[in-house]
Each structure stands twice: as C-alpha cells, then as structure tokens.
Design a protein with these regions (language model features):
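C-terminal luminal/periplasmic domains and tails of membrane-associated envelope-modifying transferases
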Residues: 1-145
Length: 145
C-alpha cells in the first residue's frame, strides 16, 4: 500500500472534516467527525516550538454504559512523550479534553500526536452493528500559551 499525506509545516487547528487524510486509526468521516476505531489514533501535525494548550473536541456524548467502568480513559502523547490522561465520565461526557504541551516536547515542523482510548462494542447499546469504536473525534486545536 502507498499512502500520500498532505503536510503543512505549521498548522494549529485540525478538523475531522478538513484534515481526515492526516488521521490514522479512524473510521469513515461522518459529517463533521469520525470515530476512532483503534486503541491508537495518530495525527501528523505541523507545530513550531512553544508551549501549547491542546484541546480535543468530541462531537457528542459517548454511550458510557458500553464501558466496563462507565468511563473511558484517554491518554495523549506527542512524539511518544506522555502529555497526560483524562477520564471521560458522566460529569464531563461530550466536553472537550484539555492538555498542556511543553515546548521541549515539540519538534519544529512535523510532530505525531497519539490519542490512546478504550474501545467499545456498538452492539452493546442495542444496535445491530458490529463496529468497535472509541471516541467521536471532531477537532484538535493547539493554542500557543
């Protein structure tokens, strides 16, 4: 297989709708979002060295009842470095996830953002689909701080 990716040296905002081809580990685009369908999802992003607030926007609330503990742990890495974990629970379901990125973890130019999340079986919510999904990813934003 040959994969072709368009890469912008510096780009701070990524949406599933506009940057779908830069994402790995996601299902087909559904309007403005895509489900992660692998425990590991990656996004190639163009950053310049500085500190950032990273925001991951979810498209909507998730069916937390499909998870064993009624929550989903999301861990984020930049270039292999763990930058934090957040738990999606009933209190924050559907809300954006926020992380702090240190300048020393940023490479000038191409960086790999990795999102690790638990998967759930769609059939557990009474649906006759056989898909295994993670989080409904809508957008990723890097805001310099």
């Amino acid at each position: 297989n040959i994969y072709v990716y368009k890469f912008n040296r510096y780009q701070l905002e990524y949406t599933a709708a506009d940057d779908y081809t830069k994402l790995y580990g996601v299902s087909a685009l559904e309007e403005t979002f895509c489900w992660t369908n692998s425990e590991i999802t990656e996004l190639a992003c163009g950053l310049y060295p500085t500190d950032y607030e990273l925001t991951i926007d979810l498209a909507f609330e998730m069916p937390l009842g499909a998870y064993q503990d009624n929550n989903n742990q999301v861990t984020v890495y930049l270039n292999g470095k763990d930058i934090g974990a957040r738990t999606i629970s009933g209190e924050n379901n559907g809300q954006a996830l926020h992380f702090y990125v240190n300048e020393e973890d940023v490479i000038d130019g191409r960086n790999i953002l990795t999102i690790r999340s638990e998967l759930w079986d769609v059939s557990l919510i009474g649906n006759d689909e056989s898909r295994i999904l993670g989080i409904p990813l809508e957008s990723v934003h890097f805001a310099p701080v």
